[in-house]
């Protein structure tokens, strides 16, 4: 029987007998026969990314801020943006990072409006489209302010579903178009309804949409007390629904809305109190991510019939609010076969809506209503990109010299298993090799638990078995890439509802990815990983990393199409807070962009404070403890005063920094100031953004 030494000839025999196809010890030449266009196809960028994202000739992701109207010199290299804002000599912001592109947001609004304008004009529809943005999708102040500003020319409004949301919507719309709708949805109490009625006193175009029949009595009573004539809408439960995850809010058993019986009671009560003229809007919602225009047309036609019936009953109807449902193509397939895809364009969606409403209204000789939609996902998803870094990867392959442990002191049973394994290897019998590997490992684990084997012996067997498995091509080729991110904070929908988003390296796209991997986050939670990807993949093509990162450099990944809901839903699991945020406009500068706003992510103090801790008191407690005289065996002499300063500085830095891994040490003054002030503004007017500069105290151009 051969000697039981890991560095003996059997290992060389194994590797010469079996030629592993899935594991190669050679480094793949990533530049050979590879191009950005091949990466674009591999990651489906041309599918989900068009017309806003593309792989450029440098192998980086480019952002096309004006969509299909973007000129070649207006492309923004995403990698250059990341380098600018993370450079210690610049802003020195820490990852993870959200990059917002207001130009993309503006283009999405304009494309949505243009799609409906074209459908209305081409079909001879005798009214107009007037959309609203549901603030629940992303309540960020600057996003909402941008939407109100960008949409002012076509009366674009807001939708609110809670008291804080109606407060922010009212405040923002004071600077918007006075005809813009403020649609008030959600469950309501007297305070909520009073706020909505107060909005009408402020000459805001506020509509109170009844979600429950009981809300009507409050509206009647409070409007009379406040001497305000309300505009009332009602949400109907349609029979039409779709079968996907997001269809659960529709249909007769949906969470929201009124049945036909309840609608008739509302109409009768309004008529009795002389307020039937106040009923002017019908709202419904089939569900988010409507997969096809066929389903959309069915739902809109049903709602249009109900709209016409309300007109017949004497209501002064003016608006049909089709709710959300305008989907985006997360996987780029345009198939509509899952919640990740929709089988239509903006133009096809608008055409289907207009045609359905027009057909029913013409049949009933009813005046065409204003069409409103609440298309939040379609508006904000594209404009925001989450950037994070892979900090390490699981070892792809090991060599025999990685486990040079002498295998001595084993039982006869273990030696027998080894002899069987050796014989199977010499015969080239892969199936038997796997069987004997399992037997050998199990027997050694039992010996370790009983105390008859030491850790060195167990490690030697583990290394031997792992090498054999790789040599016969039976090992799992998928690596684990550890990323500086919290899935629960930044991608909560992946954990919560298995929502998938495109994830792509934002650079090195001119090099062939030589590995496949899953992503594991920083949290101490087994669910903190991403192991499902678009296209039905359970791993992602990635570039190899060594101990110094990706080929000696840093490796950046981007999650795209996550501008809706992810920030609003993110928590602070393990006390990992929100990422840093920058706002980037296309400009005529040398790099084609200007950073117009930067916000450092939540510090450790911020997330502690959110959980009712007092960071200032915690700092003083720890500092005081460090200053107390203590008896210890450390006889080393040192400057005690300087030690106290070092401790205080270390504590302050830990409280003020983000909880994520810090990959670079930065003493940048801007970083320190951001930690203290939380936000910077720059002169957006100088960047072509038309912003007001009186409160803005810095500029940072690419």
From Swiss-Prot:
SUPFAM superfamilies: PLP-binding barrel. It is found in: Plastid, Chloroplast; Cytoplasm, Cytosol. Keywords: Chloroplast, Cytoplasm, Decarboxylase, Lyase, Magnesium, Plastid, Putrescine biosynthesis, Pyridoxal phosphate, Spermidine biosynthesis, Stress response, Transit peptide. Required for the biosynthesis of putrescine. Catalyzes the first step of polyamine (PA) biosynthesis to produce putrescine from arginine. Is a minor contributor to basal arginine decarboxylase (ADC) activity and putrescine biosynthesis. Accumulation of putrescine plays a positive role in freezing tolerance. Production of polyamines is essential for normal seed development. Controls PA homeostasis which is crucial for normal plant growth and development. This is Arginine decarboxylase 1, chloroplastic. GO terms for molecular function: arginine decarboxylase activity; protein homodimerization activity. The keyword Cytoplasm applies. The active site is at 524 (proton donor). InterPro entries: Ala_racemase/Decarboxylase_C, Arg_decrbxlase, De-COase2_CS, De-COase2_N, De-COase2_pyr-phos_BS, Orn/DAP/Arg_de-COase, PLP-binding_barrel. Pathway: Amine and polyamine biosynthesis; agmatine biosynthesis; agmatine from L-arginine: step 1/1.
């Amino acid at each position: 029987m051969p000697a039981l030494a890991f560095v003996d000839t059997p290992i060389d025999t194994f590797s010469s007998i079996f030629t592993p196809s899935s594991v190669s010890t050679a480094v793949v030449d990533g530049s050979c026969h590879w191009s950005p266009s091949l990466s674009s196809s591999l990651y489906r960028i041309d599918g989900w990314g068009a017309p806003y994202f593309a792989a450029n000739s440098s192998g980086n992701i480019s952002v096309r801020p004006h969509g299909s109207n973007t000129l070649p010199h207006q492309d923004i290299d995403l990698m250059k943006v990341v380098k600018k804002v993370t450079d210690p000599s610049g802003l020195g912001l820490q990852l993870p990072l959200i990059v917002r592109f207001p130009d993309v947001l503006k283009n999405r609004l304009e494309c949505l409006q243009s799609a409906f304008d074209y459908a209305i004009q081409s079909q001879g529809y005798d009214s107009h489209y007037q959309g609203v943005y549901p603030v629940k999708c992303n309540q960020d102040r600057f996003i909402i302010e941008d939407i109100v500003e960008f949409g002012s020319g076509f009366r674009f409004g807001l939708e609110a579903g809670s008291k804080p949301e109606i407060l922010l919507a009212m405040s923002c719309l004071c600077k918007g178009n006075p005809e813009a709708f403020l649609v008030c949805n959600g469950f309501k109490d007297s305070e909520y309804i009073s706020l909505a009625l107060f909005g009408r006193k402020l000459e805001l175009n506020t509509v109170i949409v009844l979600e429950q029949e009981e809300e009507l009595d409050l509206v009647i009573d409070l409007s009379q007390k406040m001497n305000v004539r309300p505009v009332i809408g009602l949400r109907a439960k349609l029979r039409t629904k779709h079968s996907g995850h997001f269809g659960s809010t529709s249909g007769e058993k949906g969470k929201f809305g009124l049945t036909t019986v309840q609608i008739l009671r509302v109409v009768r009560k309004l008529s009795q109190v002389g307020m039937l003229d106040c009923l002017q809007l019908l709202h419904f919602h089939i569900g988010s991510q409507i997969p096809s225009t066929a389903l959309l047309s069915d739902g809109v036609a049903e709602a249009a019939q109900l709209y016409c019936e309300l007109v017949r009953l004497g209501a002064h109807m003016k608006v049909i609010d089709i709710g959300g449902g305008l989907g985006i193509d997360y996987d780029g397939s345009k198939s509509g076969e899952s919640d990740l895809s929709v089988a239509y364009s903006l133009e096809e969606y608008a055409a289907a809506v207009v045609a359905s409403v027009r057909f029913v209204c013409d049949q009933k000789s009813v005046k065409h209503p204003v069409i409103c939609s609440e298309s939040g996902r379609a508006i904000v998803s594209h404009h925001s990109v989450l950037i994070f870094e892979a900090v390490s990867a699981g070892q792809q392959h090991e060599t025999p010299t990685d486990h040079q442990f002498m295998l001595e002191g084993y039982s006869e049973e273990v030696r027998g298993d080894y002899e069987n394994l050796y014989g199977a290897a010499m015969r080239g019998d892969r199936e038997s090799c796997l069987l004997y590997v399992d037997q050998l490992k199990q027997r050694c684990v039992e010996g370790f638990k009983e105390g008859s084997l030491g850790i060195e012996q167990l490690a030697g067997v583990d290394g031997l078995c792992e090498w054999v498995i790789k040599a016969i091509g039976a090992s799992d080729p998928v690596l684990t890439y550890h990323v500086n991110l919290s899935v629960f904070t930044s991608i909560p929908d992946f954990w919560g509802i298995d929502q998938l988003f495109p994830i792509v390296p934002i650079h090195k796209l001119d090099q062939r990815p030589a590995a496949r991997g899953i992503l594991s986050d920083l949290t101490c939670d087994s669910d903190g990983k991403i192991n499902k990807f678009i296209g039905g993949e359970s791993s992602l093509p990635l570039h190899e990393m060594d101990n110094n990162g990706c080929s000696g450099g840093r490796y950046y990944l981007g999650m795209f199409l996550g501008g809706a809901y992810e920030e609003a839903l993110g928590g602070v699991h393990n006390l990992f807070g929100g990422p840093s945020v920058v706002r980037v406009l296309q400009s005529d500068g040398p790099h084609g962009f200007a950073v117009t706003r930067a916000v450092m992510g939540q510090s450790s103090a911020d997330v502690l404070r959110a959980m009712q801790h007092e960071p200032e008191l915690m700092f003083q407690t720890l500092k005081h403890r460090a200053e107390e005289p203590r008896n210890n065996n450390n006889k080393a002499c040192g400057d005690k005063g300087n030690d106290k300063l070092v401790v205080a500085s270390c504590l302050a830095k830990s409280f003020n920094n983000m909880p994520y891994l810090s990959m670079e040490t930065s003493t940048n003054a801007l970083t320190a100031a951001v930690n203290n002030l939380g936000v910077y503004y720059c002169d957006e007017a100088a960047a072509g953004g038309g912003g007001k500069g009186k409160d803005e105290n810095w500029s940072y151009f690419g």
